[in-house]
Amino acid sequence: MNLHEYQAKELLEHHGVPVPRGGVCDTPEAAKAITTSLIGQGAKLFAVKSQIHAGGRGKGTFKSGYQGGVRICRTADEVYESAKGMLGNVLITKQTGADGRLVRKLLVAVAPKIKRELYLAILLDRATSRPVVMASTEG
């Protein structure tokens, strides 16, 4: 099963796990509206994240030349401009290959202060039919 980040966050939140506030959008205007709402709740820093089924989004490059499928922004206008650069464009990462993936949705969320970043995956070991939890400092 492949889930976008926003879908995984919805599942976690549904089961009581705290996740950063935010929303999903498919237009720059909607991205700005989400940001304006978050500003009204006291947020000051925002993550704009391309939603594709591939890792390495932050270091990715769009076919249009726009850099980075994950951007940290300080204002609603910056979020709007980032959304314009991402939505409807093809993001190329190490995992997508040269064809890349079309970005149709963005996650706009409050950006937490990051002290340390870890990547977590739960996989099914087919040999033992058991889940395997993997953690790494790199995605």
Regions found by a protein language model. Give the residues of each.
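A broad, structure-centric signal for solvent-exposed, well-ordered loop/edge residues
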Residues: A8-E10, K32, G55, V79-Y80, ...
